[in-house]
Amino acid sequence: MQGPWVLLLLGLRLQLSLSVIPVEEENPAFWNKKAAEALDAAKKLQPIQTSAKNLIIFLGDGMGVPTVTATRILKGQLEGHLGPETPLAMDRFPYMALSKTYSVDRQVPDSASTATAYLCGVKTNYKTIGLSAAARFDQCNTTFGNEVFSVMYRAKKAGKSVGVVTTTRVQHASPSGTYVHTVNRNWYGDADMPASALREGCKDIATQLISNMDINVILGGGRKYMFPAGTPDPEYPNDANETGTRLDGRNLVQEWLSKHQGSQYVWNREQLIQKAQDPSVTYLMGLFEPVDTKFDIQRDPLMDPSLKDMTETAVKVLSRNPKGFYLFVEGGRIDRGHHLGTAYLALTEAVMFDLAIERASQLTSERDTLTIVTADHSHVFSFGGYTLRGTSIFGLAPLNALDGKPYTSILYGNGPGYVGTGERPNVTAAESSGSSYRRQAAVPVKSETHGGEDVAIFARGPQAHLVHGVQEQNYIAHVMASAGCLEPYTDCGLAPPADESQTTTTTRQTTITTTTTTTTTTTTPVHNSARSLGPATAPLALALLAGMLMLLLGAPAES
């Protein structure tokens, strides 16, 4: 388990539940000053009206607005703050909008149809990727003639380098939206396809990964779909469940290597770091697990690269092209954590996702790089219960429910955490802070479902001001194509970005910055605590604190 996550388990549970707030926050002048600073920055904000040399899209799979907020709290607390006041890297982007995520045939979408929207610019049907809505799920013969092409494909045609980074398998729905055309998102390898589809000429996703376009950087999981059936996995050579799956006998990794000069294949972090430093490498494939990568808290830091590591490597390799690059980066395990009902896994993945955004922002300039952060869909995830500011996002509500038992702030509308017809468990703070704890859910389903509400879009860089209002999800692809002067916007009329050497002093002037409150030594306890009240009300405050301590120690508090 990683060091910061150990800190989370051991440090947040007690200290933040009895946290103190800065005394200056009791003074209206504090809030007026913060608002005035934000207002002044907004007034000075000027759109960058040039074209974008580089295009980056960060996709937080399942990262709805409630997940963004909860991630902000968690990341802030990991950094030693109370939580909600501390901005995420994506929060610092100056432009934002809402995205309507429905697909052509579903009010609540999946990651395949949404990927087609934000990557290709066209909405489509559930479980299909890279095809128009004229195609039908699982019907191979509806593929041909209904293909739509991603902005990444158009960027490659324009001479840019392109890359895909994900914490899922690289053949999964979201990353494959950059290169695939398939009526079934689950056709990862040829062994996953029916014989009829193969006879009709449909290709599995792994085959299309290496044949549909020349992708310079491919980093994620998905080794088993690239090698002949029975091929031992290099990391798990004695595990028969992790061997290659291909029935056609093809070694797709070797085929990919033979196509490109300056190409390298790696399968662990050490190899990745080594090849990233080699200036002769212009094509890099790294597959770090047989299927999806491990959750970040379960990752071996010596063997398994983090999303931040992969993002940094991709930016460095792709930046070797003077014509620029297009990069897709997915925090794909956020979604899996939610499906399992394990909010701890989802939110710690989201923290790592934000760290990757932060690193990419450090490695690029907003003068020539349009960066967009968004989600494909939300989840039926929520948090509430009037928790005190500074308490762990994984903790309990301060008062019990009507059945006299405590409940967690985070809950799911449906999921595997449904408690059945019996009594609710008497959950403790220690249990609810565990990485494998499944949150209680209102409706029993094997896998918690997606949510249908709008998701956020954050943007910085050239043409980022086009991200505004409430938009259809496919609008995102059009913003990126237009900013990069790519098809169908090759006559965009935009000047190229200014030479970086002339703009280094103004690189970040257009970003609205949010001042992080620094807690001083002069502090006041949370409102209604004993030290913040006079003698007459002190007993009430002490009772509240005692109740919080009881919750932390696992005893039910009186409601």
Swiss-Prot record:
Residues engaged in binding Zn(2+) 2: 335, 339, 450
Keyword Membrane assigned: yes
GO cellular component, one term: side of membrane
Positions of the propeptide segment: 529-559
Alphabetical list of Pfam families matching this protein: Alk_phosphatase
UniProt tissue specificity: Intestine and thymus.
Binding-site residues for Ca(2+), renumbered to this chain: 235, 288-289, 304
Residue span of region Disordered: 496-531
Active site: 111
Topological relation to the membrane, as annotated: Lipid-anchor; GPI-anchor
Cofactors required: Mg(2+); Zn(2+); Ca(2+)
First-level EC class: hydrolase
Catalyzed reactions: a phosphate monoester + H2O = an alcohol + phosphate
Residues the record lists as binding Zn(2+) 1: 61, 111, 376-377
Alphabetic keyword roster: Calcium, Cell membrane, Disulfide bond, Glycoprotein, GPI-anchor, Hydrolase, Lipoprotein, Magnesium, Membrane, Metal-binding, Signal, Zinc
Binding site for Mg(2+): 61, 174, 330
Extra remark: In most mammals there are four different isozymes: placental (ALPP), germ cell (ALPG), intestinal (ALPI) and tissue non-specific (liver/bone/kidney) (ALPL/TNAP).
Family recorded in the similarity comment: Belongs to the alkaline phosphatase family.
Stated name of the protein: Intestinal-type alkaline phosphatase
Source organism of this protein record: Mus musculus
Gene giving rise to this polypeptide: Iap
